[in-house]
Amino acid sequence: MLGSSRVSKRRPLGAVAALMVVGLTLAGCAGGAPAQNADQGSADSGNITWWGWTPDATPAEAYIKAFNKVYPNIKVTFKKLTIDGYDAAIRPALASSVGPDVFAVAPGAANGSVDIYGVNAVDLKPAVEKTLGADWESKLAPIGVSSLMNGDKLAALSVGSVFSGTIWVNKDLFDKYGLTPPKTYDEWKKVCETFKANNVGCFVQGAAQTAFNEDTLQAITDNVAPGVWEKALKGEVPWTDPAIVQALTIWKKLFDDGIMQEGALGMQQYPDANNGFMSGKYAMVMMGTWYMQYSTIEGNTAAISGAGVADPKPFTQLPIPFPDVAGTGNVGALYGDADFGLAVNQKSKNIAAATTFATWLGTSAEGQQVVADVLNDIPALITTQPNWDTVKLVNPEVQRPALEKLISDSGKSTEPRLATVVADLQTAIGVASTTVAAGEATPEQAAATLQASAAKIK
C-alpha cells in the first residue's frame, strides 16, 4: 500500500510542473517576468543539481532517496557549500548558464538571502496552488511563506523552519560529573567551574561568526524583557533601550566569568564550536532546533565522525531553555524563520523536474514526513509530525519528551530570528557583540553605536 500511494501521487506533481512551465513560457512571451529557457525539460525525468549550505549529507541523502522512490527517473545531485562560502559560489553560478537547477535561499540578510537571489528564481505559487489547492497558504506554516517571498513572487518553498533560543547539552558528560543542566546564572558558573576542574570545556560559542551571536543576545534580551529585541528590529524601541544595554552587560559577563570559552572571538560557530561539542570537548553549545537531527543514532554518529573522532560513539544530547541569566524568570523564549527554501533557477534547462523536486519535498505528505523524521527542520506542512516509532534516537526515553516539547513550543512562537534583519543591521549587531566582548566598548557605547547605525537604515 505504501508503494501504491506513492506512485498514485507521482503524476499529479509532474502535471503541476508541466502546467507551470506553460504558464512561465507565456509569462516570458508577454514580457511580464524574465523569459525562461525554451527547453524546460520533462517533469518526470532528468538530471538536476541542488546547491545549499544546508542540510548535512545525511538528511540530504534521506530526502533524495525518498524522492526517488516516487520519481525514480529524476536524478538529484546535492552539492553542499560552506555557510561563509555560499554567496561567493552562488552569485556567479546564477549569472551563468550552467548554475544549479535548484538552489537554497534563506530569509533575511544572511547567506543565500532571498531578497538578493530571489530575482533568479521561478515563481512557485502556480505549482503550489496546483498541488495543495487555492487554500494552499492555510496548509503551510505562515513563517515559511511570508519570509521566502521576493516581491509578489514565491521565490522558494520552505522545507521547514528552525528556531533558536535553546542550549544543547551533552547529558553523558553532565551525568559523569554528577551535574544538572543550569537554570540560573550562578548555576551556570558553578557547572563551568566543575567541568574546567576536570579538564572538560563547559560552554562553546564561535563568536567570530557574528550571526550566531545574535541568537545569544536575543536569548539574553528576551530573558531581561520579552519582546524588546523584536521591537528594536522593527524600530519601535531604540537599541539603547535599558533591556538591550543590560543584555550586552550580561553578554560581557559570560566572557569575564569564564562561562564563554577562552578564544571565543577567534572561533567560528561552524565548524569550530560545532566540532568542539560533537567531539565531547565541550558540554554545552548555543544551537537551535536544527540540532535535533543529532539526537538520532545515525545523525549523532555522523556528526561525531565529522568532528574528527575516529571511533564515534553516540551520546545523549538534550535541548534546555536558555538559563535565567537576568534573574527575571522569563525563560523558554524561542524565535525562528524558515530554515531554507528550495528555489528553482530561471536559467535551468530542467525547470519542470526541478519544480517537481522542490514541490514534492516542500508540500507533499511523503516529502514532509521524511523532513519530520530526519529532525533537521520543523515541517512546513502544518499537519506533519515526526513518526516517533520509526525515529531511532540515541536515548528515546530521555530525548523524546524533550524533543516533543521543543517542537510544540516552537509551533507557538511568532518571534522572528533573522528574517527581518537587513544586512547593515546584522553587521552593526555583530560589531556590538564583538567590541563589548573584547572590552573595546562598554555596553552603553556599543548600544549607542548600534542605534546610530540603525538610524541610518531606512
PLM region descriptions:
Residues 53, 250-350:
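Extracytoplasmic/periplasmic substrate-binding proteins
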Residues 123-140, 224-246, 300, 305-313, ...:
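Short, solvent-exposed loop/beta-turn-alpha elements that line the ligand-binding surface or hinge
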Residues 158, 232, 380-385, 395-453:
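C-terminal capping/gating helix-and-loop segments adjacent to ligand/active sites or protein-protein/ligand interfaces
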Residues 194-195, 234-265:
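Glycine-centered hinge/linker elements that transmit conformational signals in sensory
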